[in-house]
Amino acid sequence: EVAQNEPALRAEKSRYAVTFREYLTDDCRLVLANLRDAVASGAQVANYLSVDGLLGENQAEGVTAQCALTGRSIQVKAAVVVNATGPWVDATRQLEADVEPRLVLSRGIHVAVRRTDLPVNNLVTMTGSDGRPVFALPRGPVTYLGTTDTRHLEPATHHPSVEQIDVDFLLTTVEDHFDISLTPKQVTGAWAGLRPLISKPEQTTSELSRKDEVWVGPRGVVTVAGGKLTGYLQMADDVLESVDTQLSAQQSLNSSAVFSGTTSTSKTLPGGDIASDLSLAAQTLAADHDLALPIAERLVRRYGSETEAVITLGKEPVAPGAHLLSGEIVWAVQVDGALFLDDVLVRRTGSMWFDPEVGVLIEPVAEQLAGLLGWTSEQTSEQISLLERQQETDLTFI
């Protein structure tokens, strides 16, 4: 049965199989959906705004922050401040007091190759030479591989480098498990991220627990660190319990007033209320709008029950033969808050990572964004150059 489902696997390496669903997630769109839901519930959300200080003396009473777009500084008053800054948790804690670091940063990379070069039909789990698990996952026209686990000794950054040694580790692992040999030149997309792990003496990054921890600092800042994306709802509940304790101690509000009616486990996020299964929804969408089935499947998986609204904004491809539709660009700006070219092609649509033909998308998408956001020709050219340089940096190992 394994051989029938995954004929490219080495039979001697894969005698058994299980179904594993944890990785059926688009992390960027999951974050966006949570932000949109928060706004709908009354939250104020600000992007490109970095915190650089705390208000108050003995107790944190808010933050000072600077807008990365205008340079303007603002103050935000708050009864409780939460530090949920991921790899920047320790740097943010330094705003509260001179404290010892509690994090170890682990760098993980992914690489994507054409699905024709590594044909898999399901999530395939492999074991690397050091015993670490490596996954191969099909996504549209590509199969992507990940991840690695390497201690990151430099300060946290939004764009960690994709190192040659990590790429070689992933490609070698594939060769050990498939009758396929991949080279770096076959990689069409690559990216790296940082895991903020709670430090434990004498443990390597792969040995460190992924469990989250919540604690309160000397000025009352609630900090959360560690954890995994799949456990974010429970992490949020843990943070809110700590916030509730802080508020109750201040005699500002009681718990029933603060969190009445909020149940994270039963909440449906925007786009999540699909009545039928995804395959049927995609088939219906393709028939109703004369779309190729692969495009319809991608749209339904990306936008869920909001797919019809996206198509209404434009169902023509952004370039001849492209799978990305013009309505997706409008949606990215008007609904998902995109401001720059990389916002759209990296975080909102994932095209930079998961579309081997992304090169033909860059200029037409930039031109469409220029019309939506009022860019000058110079600003448009700058956005194109920035994205192309980032792509070149990510693929330096080729």
Residue ranges: model-predicted function:
Residues V18-V80, A236:
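Helical element adjacent to the flavin cofactor pocket in flavoenzyme catalytic cores
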Residues V39, Y48, T70, L105, ...:
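Residues that act as N-cap/strand-start positions at coil-to-secondary-structure junctions
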Residues E1-E12, T19-C28, A40-S41, T85-P87, ...:
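C-terminal accessory subdomains/tails of enzymes that are appended
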Residues Y16, D52, E61, D90, ...:
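Glycine-centered loop/turn positions within well-structured domains
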Residues G56-Q59, C67-L137:
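Flavin-dependent oxidoreductases
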Residues V51-L54, F135-A136, V214:
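A structural signal for short hydrophobic beta-strand segments in well-ordered beta-sheet cores
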